[in-house]
């Protein structure tokens, strides 16, 4: 029987072999940026790096083990994706990358080194079932669902443990240190899906699908959460999932609605709130995108446009956004496979990358995934300009881009 170390080595070799199939190696010196995805594999999680050229095309880079395990499923449904927004995140200066290991209840920090990564540390997230993280100016927070941990991946059903969040300080070199007093309980069975820190580190926000609300926690001088204010989900919507914060405190949520078997689907919405005045937690605006299970949001650098991917519709919606939080849906583009999940955009906001998963609906088998490449037009519309081979694992969860 192979040792754990041998199994991990074999797994990494297999991922590298499949990830490079059908892709040109590309000139290393031509990289203008990168796309990072997490395999979320139960046998050993890893981050796959793609190099981006000036035309937005992606070329396979390396595969870097996290030192932890992914999950064969997630706490909500017996499918091999994280069911969250934020499994992989970059520091604002893009010099550090953080990847969550659901199956090990840990998070790993990497230094970004040219076209590769250097692993720095892997630490406990202080809870069970970590699924989302965000990093800002030396502070990182991570949510824990309280769901099945090691030994019970993909067991299905709602989490039975205590949902929490926990904060860390990270050094310029990537070392993670827990923030004393930061571990905070979230409502039971709240199913946290995303967490975001505001750039000034005065507050953070967490979407809680199971509780049908988003909570805004003020942070004290030591970056410890204080008493939160709850933003109930917009009337006519349900289950806030993805989360984005703008530079002028507009908070956006992607409300997944009631997808099958809970409801008929087609009722997802994008909703905005004023996060600067939590004493009046009512929506600024809400616009239906007529999709099912809208669960991920990415904004352009100037915050004038945004994109929301819908898992069960297999679509990416474009929308415009004003400084006052007014939302207007522009249109939608299909992904090349069945399910649309995590997204990332290039730092110049010229290209959008979307994880597109090939699913066998009869067997509920997530067979493989690829990255679809879209050009972001000046009017916020998208144009599909390429795709990688269907070479990534079907469990791939989390994406960050530079």
Predicted regions and their residues:
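Secretory targeting and sorting signals
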Residues: 1-29
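Residue position within the beta-strands of beta-propeller blades
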Residues: 37, 99, 142, 206, ...
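Short loop/turn segments immediately following the C-termini of beta-strands
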Residues: 40-42, 52, 102, 145-148, ...
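Short loop/turn segments immediately following beta-strands, especially the blade-tip
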Residues: 49-58, 109-116, 167-176, 217-225, ...
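A short beta-strand motif characteristic of beta-propeller blades
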Residues: 61-78, 118-124, 177-186, 226-234, ...
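Beta-rich, blade/repeat-based domains predominating
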Residues: 67-90, 125-139, 148, 184-203, ...
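Asp-box/WD-like beta-propeller blade repeats and closely related beta-sheet repeat scaffolds
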Residues: 116-198
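Blade-level signature of beta-propeller repeat domains, shared across WD40, Kelch, NHL, RCC1
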Residues: 364-402
